[in-house]
């Protein structure tokens, strides 16, 4: 069986956890392929809500194997805390597999992330301060420490000593911060190694074998398309590639194994942190969207910026990711509006464009061009068939589909597992 990819089609927080959980019942493996604990998924099952940061949402399905791929950067302390929290709630985490090739977030990564962000002042990007960027930086610089190094204490110490020789110079002499002691880190990470060793595996080989045997593999991205380090609103982006092109690399499988790419997209738009946001609503309407939609970060708790649906970035996401399907979430949040504006293009320096601007300078100056669509006032959270939605809601979905250029195959009308209207089967 081929693999399928699930990605965020906006600035993250689109509802990927809900989508992954829904599809999890039909897949054998769910693989996280990039990012770190700087993002979060929320999955609601009945009266229970689960916030996941590193562990793939598939862990909540007993017949599904959750995998953390080689493209992820892992803070082992955070991972173990998340595992313990799930275990305490009766969730079996023994099936979790971790790629030996994934990189570790170290104490010096967190320290440098926090102090650098403070040093930048008003020019700061708005990172979570969890060390993700510095960890990816060391990976590219070939000075990183990987999960497999936990299996060899001698190699781990050798790599750590080499890393801290430089990092401590920066921390103490540039930022006037305390040096990080090798022995303390070795002791801390040895305890992590003891607990994580049973979960470490050659996950790329395992997944390729599973695909050859006809198993279904779901590749789950974190964050969103507009936060991609190459294709996002740089420099206000994450340090990895959430887009579909990285899914195979970050999971350790060949790209020809993938035949479907599903983009998760909200019925409106949100963003966390700094950076351009053409449709942002800095008014009472924006506050209302935030309140009704519960728009606060799973990882940071920060209030999300809110705005109307942006068809320009939707088209961009379809193009950059090669999306075959859209999964529209939070349609229920828009109930109660007389009309719902949708951004169909931008005005930049007096000129109209319907496509993503080539430069970030242009994007910063983009003014949204709206069309007003009829709204609806009915509560749609209990609707179980797309055909039973109010006509205006159906028309809204159809319009977004046409503007984005990809079929809407599922619609979320609430946070629960059962609150999803499937239009086209995704698996």
UniProtKB/Swiss-Prot annotation:
The keyword Magnesium applies. HAMAP family: Adenylosucc_synth (MF_00011). The gene is purA. GTP binds at residues 12-18, 40-42, 304, 330-332, 412-414. It is found in: Cytoplasm. InterPro entries: Adenylosuccin_syn_GTP-bd, Adenylosuccin_syn_Lys_AS, Adenylosuccinate_synth_dom1, Adenylosuccinate_synth_dom2, Adenylosuccinate_synth_dom3, Adenylosuccinate_synthetase, P-loop_NTPase. It catalyses: IMP + L-aspartate + GTP = N(6)-(1,2-dicarboxyethyl)-AMP + GDP + phosphate + 2 H(+). It comes from Parafrankia sp. (strain EAN1pec). Binds 1 Mg(2+) ion per subunit. Its cofactor is Mg(2+). Its main location: cytoplasm. This is Adenylosuccinate synthetase.
């Amino acid at each position: 069986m081929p693999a399928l990819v699930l990605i965020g089609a906006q600035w993250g927080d689109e509802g990927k956890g809900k989508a992954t959980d829904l599809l999890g019942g039909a897949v054998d493996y769910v693989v996280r392929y990039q990012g770190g604990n700087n993002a979060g998924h929320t999955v609601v099952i009945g009266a229970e809500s689960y916030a996941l940061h590193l562990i793939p949402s598939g862990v909540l399905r007993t017949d599904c194997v959750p995998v953390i791929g080689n493209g992820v950067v892992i803070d082992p302390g955070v991972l173990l805390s998340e595992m313990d929290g799930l275990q305490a709630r009766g969730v079996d985490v023994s099936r979790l597999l971790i790629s030996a090739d994934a990189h570790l977030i170290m104490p010096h990564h967190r320290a440098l992330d926090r102090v650098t962000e403070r040093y930048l002042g008003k020019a700061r990007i708005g990172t979570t301060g969890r060390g993700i960027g510095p960890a990816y930086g060391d990976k590219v610089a070939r000075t990183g420490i990987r999960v497999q190094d936990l299996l060899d204490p001698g190699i781990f110490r050798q790599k750590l000593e080499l890393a801290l020789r430089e990092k401590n110079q920066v921390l103490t002499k540039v930022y006037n911060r305390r040096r990080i002691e090798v022995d303390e880190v070795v002791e801390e990470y040895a305890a992590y190694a003891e607990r994580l060793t049973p979960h470490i595996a050659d996950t790329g080989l395992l997944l390729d074998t599973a695909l050859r045997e006809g198993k279904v593999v779901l590749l789950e991205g974190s964050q969103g398309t507009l936060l991609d380090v190459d294709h996002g609103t740089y420099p206000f982006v994450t340090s990895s590639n959430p887009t579909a092109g990285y899914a195979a690399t970050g999971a350790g499988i060949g790209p020809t194994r993938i035949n479907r790419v599903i983009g998760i997209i909200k019925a409106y738009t949100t963003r966390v942190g700094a950076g351009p946001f053409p449709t942002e609503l800095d008014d009472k309407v924006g506050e209302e969207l935030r309140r009704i939609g519960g728009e606060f970060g799973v990882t940071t708790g920060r209030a999300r910026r809110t705005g109307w649906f942006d068809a320009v970035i939707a088209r961009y996401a379809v193009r950059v990711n090669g999306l075959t399907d859209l999964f529209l979430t939070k349609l229920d949040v828009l109930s109660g509006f007389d009309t719902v504006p949708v951004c169909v293009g931008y005005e930049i320096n007096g000129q109209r464009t319907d496509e993503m601007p080539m430069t970030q300078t242009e994007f910063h100056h983009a003014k949204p061009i709206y069309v007003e669509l009829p709204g609806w006032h009915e509560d749609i959270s209990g609707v179980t068939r797309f055909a039973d939605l109010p006509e205006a809601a159906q028309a809204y979905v159809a319009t977004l589909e046409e503007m984005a250029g990809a079929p809407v195959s599922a619609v979320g009308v609430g946070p629960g597992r059962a609150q999803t209207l499937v239009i086209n089967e995704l698996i």
